[in-house]
Structures are given as structure tokens and as C-alpha cells.
């Protein structure tokens, strides 16, 4: 894994510092554990085995690191306002981007991080928004023959993403983020999450570190990551992600897919062998292709890379040097 992150040799010239999970855990110092077992169980996604031990090993050190970054960011903002002889008229939220493949554990990580940060002594207001709501509606994707490209860069309304993040960074109140239903596998028309001047925003999705081609006319093209103060990439060997994806699909076949309102309800009626074959096809033709072409190449752009092992728990950490 690290060979692709570390493009330069010898290793001392790498833009990252590398740590084992045990080494990383030591950076927790005296950061308190503010979550309970039941809370972690409630926050984790289907098939994700994360427990309190994993929170202690990885997340408390991460919480301490982010606290330092947020404090430094706020200090710099105040100093810049003083330098410009400006009164502090609005609050600039600290935005954290969370990226990685489908089935790698982004959602669990983002939810647990949200709870930990909100329980800092300063009690910051923390919001979590996913990019799912910024997908084009299925009707639009069907019209453009893009349903099989859902999740690829062109299936997202990037303009809407940039407008949303720009409004958040500008300190605007009651900014709307469109909502998405995993039951109907579609954007919910007319339904929104209201984001009202958070201290910290966690923005999670497979595409948040992606870049676009620069226009030939030389005009400025903003990237989603331009709005981030810190970014995290959840990583694992693609063979492991493949297994987790298939396992999750088969679990959903026995649970959520059984709901008649589910977009994937038809898969619950198939035999186990037929359903597994469908899942394999979805992985090979859509998700693996998207991972290799669009998601994995963004990994070196992250400030922090969390590498998972076969048990779905984080084994290695890479932190970008400042």
C-alpha cells in the first residue's frame, strides 16, 4: 500500500509519517473516552466490527490531533482578522473531508468522529453531511443512460456541492443539503438537511478528494477539497474491500432488501447463489472500476490515511508532514 502513497525514495523524503496502530494509539495521551459500548454499536454500519478498543486505539488520538488543528485554525483566523483590521463578523467552520471506497467503513468512521468531536470540552457544534444527496436523481441518470455510472464523478452535481461548501465556509446560516434514501436508492425530492453555522462540518463521500481537468481557457476551477481544512482517506486492499462489499450485500439481502419499498427488493427473492452473482457483477463492473479509476488515485491527496486490515480494523496510519 505505502509504495503508491510514498512516490519518493528514500522514505525520509516521503510527504507522510507512518505509524502502526499501536504507535498511533500512544498519541492519545490523556484524551478521555467519551463514548459507551452501546453508542459505538449504534453508530457502526452493518458488518463493521468496530468496538471500544478500536475507538481507544485509533479515534482518540485522531480526536486529539483534530483538536490541535481546529485550535490552530481558529487562532490563525483571529490573527488574520487583526492583521486586516477587521472585526470578527462571522464564524468560519472547520471542514473535514472523509473519502474512500464503498464498503470500506467511511460512514461508521464519520459518525463516530462526529460524536467524539462534539464531546470536546468546548462542546463544538458538529454536523455531518454525505455526498449521496448530491447525486443526480435517478430520473436524470436514466435519461442520460448513466444509471450504471452511479457513483462515478459525472453522476454528481458538483456545482451544487461547491455552492453548498462555499456557503458553509462563508458562514451562511441554514444552508440546505439534499437528502438521499438508501431504501429508494434515490435523492429525496424536496427534502433537505439544514446546516446552520456549525463549528465543524464533516463532509463524507467517495468523491470528496477528486479533481477535475483544468479548462483550456485557463479559468479557475475550484475542487471540492479546496474547502477542506483536513482530509482523511479510509484505505484497504481492494481484495478485502471486495469481500466486505459482497458480505454486506448478502446481509442486506436478508434485511433491508426484504422491505417491499426497497429499490433492491428483487434481489431478496433470488437464491443465495444468484444474489452473490449479482453482487460480484456490481463489484467488478461498477465499484472496482470506480475505485481504480477515480477513488484510489485521490489517496495521496489526503492529510491522513487510515489503512484497514482483514478484520476491518485499522492497522496502519499515514500522517502528512506539515
UniProtKB/Swiss-Prot annotation:
Q: Which Pfam families match?
A: PRK
Indicate the enzyme's highest-level EC class.
Answer: transferase
Which InterPro entries does the UniProt entry name for this protein? P-loop_NTPase, PanK, PRK/URK
Extract the SUPFAM superfamilies matched here.
Answer: P-loop containing nucleoside triphosphate hydrolases
- Major location category of this protein: cytoplasm
Give the metabolic or biological pathway.
Cofactor biosynthesis; coenzyme A biosynthesis; CoA from (R)-pantothenate: step 1/5
Annotated compartments: Cytoplasm
What does the entry list as the binding residues for ATP? 100-107
> Which HAMAP family does the entry link to?
Pantothen_kinase_1
Q: Which family does it belong to?
A: Belongs to the prokaryotic pantothenate kinase family.
Q: What name has this protein been given in UniProt? A: Pantothenate kinase
Amino acid at each position: 500500500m505505502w509504495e503508491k502513497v510514498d512516490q519518493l525514495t528514500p522514505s525520509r523524503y516521503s510527504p507522510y509519517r507512518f505509524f502502526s496502530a499501536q504507535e498511533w494509539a500512544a498519541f492519545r495521551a490523556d484524551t478521555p473516552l467519551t463514548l459507551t459500548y452501546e453508542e459505538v454499536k449504534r453508530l457502526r454500519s452493518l458488518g463493521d466490527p468496530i468496538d471500544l478498543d478500536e475507538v481507544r486505539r485509533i479515534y482518540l488520538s485522531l480526536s486529539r490531533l483534530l483538536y490541535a488543528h481546529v485550535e490552530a485554525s481558529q487562532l490563525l483566523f483571529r490573527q488574520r482578522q487583526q492583521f486586516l483590521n477587521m472585526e470578527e463578523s462571522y464564524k468560519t467552520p472547520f471542514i473535514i473531508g472523509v473519502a474512500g471506497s464503498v464498503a470500506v467503513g467511511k460512514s461508521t468512521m464519520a459518525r463516530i468522529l462526529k460524536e467524539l468531536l462534539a464531546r470536546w470540552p468546548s462542546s463544538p457544534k458538529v454536523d455531518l453531511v454525505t455526498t449521496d444527496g448530491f447525486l443526480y436523481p435517478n430520473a436524470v441518470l436514466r435519461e442520460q443512460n448513466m444509471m450504471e455510472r452511479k457513483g462515478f464523478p459525472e453522476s454528481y452535481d458538483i456545482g451544487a456541492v461547491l455552492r453548498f461548501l462555499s456557503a458553509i465556509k462563508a458562514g451562511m446560516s441554514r444552508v440546505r443539503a439534499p437528502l438521499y434514501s438508501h431504501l429508494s436508492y434515490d435523492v429525496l425530492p424536496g427534502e433537505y438537511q439544514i446546516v446552520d453555522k456549525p463549528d465543524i462540518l464533516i463532509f463524507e463521500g467517495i468523491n470528496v478528494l477528486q479533481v477535475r481537468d483544468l479548462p483550456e481557457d485557463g479559468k479557475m476551477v475550484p475542487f471540492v477539497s479546496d474547502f477542506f481544512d483536513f482530509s482523511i482517506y479510509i484505505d484497504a486492499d481492494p481484495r478485502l474491500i471486495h469481500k466486505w462489499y459482497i458480505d454486506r450485500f448478502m446481509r442486506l439481502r436478508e434485511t433491508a432488501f426484504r422491505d417491499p419499498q426497497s429499490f433492491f427488493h428483487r434481489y431478496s427473492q433470488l437464491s443465495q447463489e444468484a444474489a452473490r452473482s449479482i453482487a460480484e457483477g456490481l463489484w467488478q463492473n461498477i465499484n472496482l472500476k470506480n475505485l481504480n479509476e477515480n477513488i484510489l488515485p485521490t489517496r495521496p491527496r489526503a492529510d491522513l490515511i487510515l489503512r484497514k486490515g482483514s478484520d476491518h480494523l485499522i492497522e496502519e496510519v499515514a500522517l502528512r508532514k506539515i
